Amino acid sequence: MGHKVVVFDISVVRALWETRVKKHKAWQKKEAERLEKSALEKIKEEWDFVAQCRRKGVPQAEYCKNGFVDTSTRLLEKIERNSVSRQSARVKDRDKRRSPFVFELSGTQWKELPDSLKEQTHLKEWYIHSTLIQIIPTYIELFQAMKILDLPKNQITCLPAEIGRLKNLKELNVSFNHLKSIPPELGDCEHLERLDCSGNLDLMDLPFELSNLKQVTFVDISANKFSSVPICVLRMCRLQWLDISSNNLSDLPQDIDRLEELQGFLLYKNKLTYLPQAMLNLKKLTLLVVSGDHLVEVPTALCDASTPLKFVSLVDNPIDKTGCQDTEDTVESERDRQHFDKEFMKAYIEDLKEREAVPSYTTKVSFSLQL
């Protein structure tokens, strides 16, 4: 007798299997809906989101709305994306800085520049950050090929007048130092394109001589003590980006429309009560960020949805600082907070640029909760 062969009806087996698959998928869908409606699942999601925000250093005010956690916010994702982008940029910068024309220095072990630097006058770029260096030596004038001076987050208290002899200088970044003034000789650097003096906290004015800087397209003097827009800034005819947020401005000059090329204007965290009609003459302005706490008069056309202008009004309720002492720790804490604010706003502005339908008027409400 040969082998016994059992023949199945394949169509019956397939129908049985497909029925079971459909039942399993229906059960999965029903279970997913149950979990979605479950308060415990929502609480777990919010708790995980809050924990992640805290690890990233995002303040509570940015992900809470009216006392509720907003897990749909894209800010955390944006900050993470920016962090990855910055890391990638740093790798590229590091490769670039291996050039014999680039000098790089960082770390709190450095209290002054190395003596050997004086002999390397061929250098074109300095990248010095997060050190305890307080003084930039006068021999900097020997570096006639210098194009970039990137000196953020040090302890620099003053810049030498000799900096004005760097005729090829294009970028100067002295943000988050301890500067109280800028030398008028900087106005002799006629090829300067970018100037960043943000986060020095006590800087109150820029010298009139900087009016000579006709190539400047970017100025950041945020987080200082400016009570008005410096006259020299109004004479920078090619200026495209001006950040004067977190200062003591109570009004804007009536001739603000002299900045015909201005595209981005950041004014938030000041004491402005109105915006002048001259703002309407800034035809190239595409981004305007103000604090709406004190504003009582805004030209209607600025909020017109038909214009390309993104008008952002931030309504902020800062933590009460009553009783805070002006100690060194308090100053450093303020410096760190201002630095985080700038990073947050960069992420927010980049997010605005990526939206397909950008609101013409945006309000951010933040609050503090004391337990």
UniProtKB/Swiss-Prot annotation:
Biological process according to GO: cellular response to leukemia inhibitory factor
InterPro entries membership: Leu-rich_rpt, Leu-rich_rpt_4, Leu-rich_rpt_typical-subtyp, LRR_dom_sf, LRR_domain-containing
Keywords: Leucine-rich repeat, Repeat
Entries under Pfam families matching the protein: LRR_4, LRR_8
Lineage: superkingdom: Eukaryota
UniProt xrefs under PROSITE patterns: LRR (PS51450)
Keyword DNA repair belongs to the record: no
Protein name: Leucine-rich repeat-containing protein 2
Gene name tied to this protein: Lrrc2
